[in-house]
Amino acid sequence: DGHFDYVQEHLRILSAFYGVLKPMDGITPYRLEMQAKAAIGDSTNLYDFWGDNLYWEVIDDSWIIINLASKEYSKCIEKYLTPDDRYITISFCEQSGGRLITKGTYAKMARGEMVRYMAENHIENPDDIKEFDHLGYVFRDDISSDREYIFERKTVK
C-alpha cells in the first residue's frame, strides 16, 4: 500500500517536451528526444532551452538524486550539480568478452524494476537500494562507488 503515493512523491520523469513530470501528470503523446536540434528563442538545442530548470525541479531538501535516466537525459541534471548534492547513478551491466557492458533493453527493464522495488519497499536511504536483486541483477560493491551503484546481471551459461 502507498506505492502510488511513494512514486508520486519521489519519482520524476524527464521529458524533452514537458520538462519534469510526476508519474500521474497527464500528457499528450509526442515524439521528441532531448538531443534533437531545436531553435527556441536564443537556444539552439533543448539542453540550452531547459538550462538549470530541470535540476531545480528534481532536487529537494534531501539533496539526493538517484539517477535512473539515460545519459541523454542525465546530462540535463549533471551539469548543474553542486558539492552539496548526493547524486547516485544506477548502472545495470553484464559480462561480455571479459568486460562489463550495458545492454539497452535489459537496462530499461531493470530501471523500471528498480522503480518498482523502491516503491514497494518505500526506500528513503540510498544504501537500501543495494539490496535490489530483480531480473538476475546483483549489486557489485567491489566496483561501485558513492556516485555510481553498479548492478551486474548474472547470465545462465
Task: Describe the predicted segments one by one.
Residues D1-D146, I150, K154-K157:
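Internal, well-folded beta-alpha domain core
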